[in-house]
């Protein structure tokens, strides 16, 4: 008579076979997305970009070079392109919002503009065309110790009575006392005061990251080519002289200020590890060792890769693409797996697993000619900045 263990073996074999077929732990690298040859992916990405650019410009085919004027681009066109490129670069330099930071309540702080009798204003020529607003960055850092904690920053101005409609523009003080355009506003006539608000989150983050002591804005009347009068007609509270006593105190309290919304420092410790991991992810994505879903570098040279000479600036750009498997949990004891099985039964050629797709995209400014006329365009969603599994 065989031992009891051998007698039970026929009964145990089906159970052992079931355990082999049914993993009890996540299949970390499992993905039903088909793997593709890297060179094939790059070629397909290049062809997709060719069609994408023509489609965004509403062109059926690349424009003819025609009689393009020789020499460099006109100065005005180049200045417009450079300002557009700088604005895009400034926006892309802003850190991505922290999902965990968004959970916490935000502390709101008001930082008043440096008063107009400060010597910093003496460095800028008084003009009927503009007003200047400067802020002490030490006060900003006291309110927001780290740039990543800043959720939103608004420049608030109290506009007094305005008799005529006026188009105004806001600029940021840049390096070498130059000014970078930020935004504009069309102000309608009004008999009552009104608060104006400009979103300057990215600018304040830059200030917090740099070591400067005083930073500022300029509000100017729109310089119209067909108008000789470019006087700033709007009266902003805090710049009118001749007030005394309590009225002057109230007037000074309502001078321009920055409204800051940030995660308090005592709640920030929890975010340190997640920020560190995300910073490492960026490095991993551009290394050859990372196999999972990540941003892969791809530089497009317009002449070499597309055979185009009609785009004058830039000569090329980093389009990038997303590639890599997306891990997910596969277990037969979940309802999700039953749905997947049913999905695969009815769609045998489809992928039920998450796939690597773009998450954040950036625009691309270009200069090109239509006949003899140069044009500056901003093409949306042309640069892959980050990827996700979806």
Swiss-Prot record:
Extent of the signal sequence: 1-29
Effect on the protein upon substituting residue 45 to C: In IBDIMDE; decreased TGFB1-mediated activation of SMAD signaling; reduced levels of secreted TGFB1
The entry's keywords: Cleavage on pair of basic residues, Disease variant, Disulfide bond, Extracellular matrix, Glycoprotein, Growth factor, Mitogen, Secreted, Signal
Outcome of mutating residue 110 to C: In IBDIMDE; decreased TGFB1-mediated activation of SMAD signaling; reduced levels of secreted TGFB1
Stretch list, region Arm domain: 75-271
UniProt effect for mutating residue 218 to C: In CAEND; higher levels of active TGF-beta-1 in the culture medium; enhances osteoclast formation in vitro
Motif residue range(s): Cell attachment site: 244-246
Positions annotated with a glycan in the UniProt record: 82, 136, 176
Record region (Straightjacket domain): 30-74
Paired cysteines (S-S): 285-294, 293-356, 322-387, 326-389
Marked site: Cleavage: 278-279
Tissue specificity comment: Highly expressed in bone. Abundantly expressed in articular cartilage and chondrocytes and is increased in osteoarthritis (OA). Colocalizes with ASPN in chondrocytes within OA lesions of articular cartilage.
Phenotype upon changing residue 387 to R: In IBDIMDE; loss of TGFB1-mediated activation of SMAD signaling; mutant TGFB1 is not secreted
Post-translational modification, as annotated: Transforming growth factor beta-1 proprotein: The precursor proprotein is cleaved in the Golgi apparatus by FURIN to form Transforming growth factor beta-1 (TGF-beta-1) and Latency-associated peptide (LAP) chains, which remain non-covalently linked, rendering TGF-beta-1 inactive.
Effect of residue 278 to A: Prevents cleavage and subsequent maturation of the protein. Generated in order to mimic the structure of the Transforming growth factor beta-1 proprotein
Region (Bowtie tail): 226-252
Single GO cellular component term: blood microparticle
Family to which the UniProt record says this protein belongs: Belongs to the TGF-beta family.
Record text on subunit structure and interactions: Homodimer; disulfide-linked. Interacts with the serine proteases, HTRA1 and HTRA3: the interaction with either inhibits TGFB1-mediated signaling and the HTRA protease activity is required for this inhibition. May interact with THSD4; this interaction may lead to sequestration by FBN1 microfibril assembly and attenuation of TGFB signaling. Interacts with CD109, DPT and ASPN. Interacts with EFEMP2. Interacts with TSKU; the interaction contributes to regulation of the hair cycle.
Protein name, entry field: Transforming growth factor beta-1 proprotein
């Amino acid at each position: 008579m065989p031992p009891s263990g051998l007698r039970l073996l026929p009964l145990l074999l089906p159970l052992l076979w079931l355990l082999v077929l049914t993993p009890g732990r996540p299949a970390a690298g499992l993905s039903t997305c088909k793997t593709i040859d890297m060179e094939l992916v790059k070629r397909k990405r290049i062809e997709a970009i060719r069609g994408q650019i023509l489609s965004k410009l509403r062109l059926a085919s690349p424009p003819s070079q025609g009689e393009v004027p020789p020499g460099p681009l006109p100065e005005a066109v180049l200045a417009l392109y450079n300002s557009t490129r700088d604005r895009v670069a400034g926006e892309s330099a802003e850190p991505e919002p922290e999902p965990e930071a968004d959970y916490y309540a935000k502390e709101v702080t008001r930082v008043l503009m440096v008063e107009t009798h400060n010597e910093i204003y003496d460095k800028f020529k008084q003009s009927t065309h503009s007003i200047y607003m400067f802020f002490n960055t030490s006060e900003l850092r006291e309110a927001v110790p780290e740039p990543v904690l800043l959720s939103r920053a608004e420049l608030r101005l109290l506009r007094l009575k305005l008799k005529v409609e006026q188009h105004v523009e806001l600029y940021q003080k840049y390096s070498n006392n130059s000014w970078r355009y930020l935004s504009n506003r069309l102000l309608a006539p009004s008999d009552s005061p009104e608060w104006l608000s400009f979103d300057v989150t990215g600018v304040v983050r830059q200030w917090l990251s740099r070591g400067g002591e005083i930073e500022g804005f300029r509000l100017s009347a729109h310089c119209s080519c067909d108008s000789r009068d470019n006087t700033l007609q709007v009266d902003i509270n805090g710049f009118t002289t001749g007030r005394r006593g309590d009225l002057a105190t109230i007037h000074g309290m309502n001078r321009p200020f920055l409204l800051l919304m940030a995660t308090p420092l005592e709640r920030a410790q929890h975010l340190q590890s997640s920020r560190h991991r995300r910073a490492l992810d960026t490095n991993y994505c551009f290394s050859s060792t990372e196999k999972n879903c990540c941003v892969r570098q791809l530089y497009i040279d317009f002449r070499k890769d597309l055979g185009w000479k009609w785009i004058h600036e830039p000569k090329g750009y980093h389009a990038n693409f997303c590639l890599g498997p997306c891990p997910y949990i596969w277990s037969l004891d979940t309802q999700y797996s039953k749905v997947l099985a049913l999905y695969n039964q009815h769609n045998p050629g489809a992928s039920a697993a998450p796939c690597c797709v773009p998450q954040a995209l950036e625009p691309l400014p270009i200069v090109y000619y239509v006949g003899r006329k140069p044009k500056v365009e901003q093409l949306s969603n042309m640069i892959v900045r980050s990827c996700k599994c979806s």
